[in-house]
Amino acid sequence: MWSGAVNVLISGGFSSAYEQLMPEFERTSGIKVATRSGASQGAGPQTIAAQLARGVSADVVILSREGLSELIAANMIVAGTDVNLARVPLGVAVRAGTPKPDVSSVEAIKRLLLKAKTIAVPESTSGIWLKTDLFPRLGIVEEINIKATPRGTHATEMVAEGGADVAVMPVSEILHATGVDFAGHLPPEIQFVQVFSAAVVAGSGDIDGATRLIEFLASARASEAIRKSGMEPFATSN
């Protein structure tokens, strides 16, 4: 992507914490970072896997563990460099300023989804789980209108602009999104906790810089920003 920098391909779920942390990393390490976004999983040219396959240059990927597992299987990752960074549960977003719905129980979630004219979900890891696991388990697939968006940001934009009544997605993509409010987490019985991980890309031209970046993101120094973005870090805070 860019010469003279550590090139990162990142999915939306970890982006809020990442953006908060990069100025400190660049300042303390002297390493410049260049960032490009992509989806953890799914179809289309903007998934991280598709970008790597067509030759987009990257040193580090940050994405869901499910998406990273696919990259590892495709030999796109330097063996042994993958590190788990954070866990994030799924939550519900509604248009800012509207009454927050009851999301405290499975039945409340089911009522909310059946009432919604349109439900926005990301096309990536969480959306795949919602469409193939949760919605069928609730027995509502044939009764709801699901709009899968290429990125989580598109899902919150749909809700903010009135194109969807609710979005179900990682909490980290809701808390700082413009035009939406966080209504709450999915109940524990139907929760999906997503893990975001990082790894060095095979063929990286700066393995040292890439490794230092991942070590920083996995360290206790990054924990506060990760928590503020709605995730739970794997690292223990100082």
Please report, for each region that a protein language model flagged, where it lies by residue.
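Exported/periplasmic ABC-transporter solute-binding proteins
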Residues: 1-46, 53-57, 65-66, 70-74, ...
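Phosphate-/polyanion-interacting regions in eukaryotic proteins
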Residues: 62
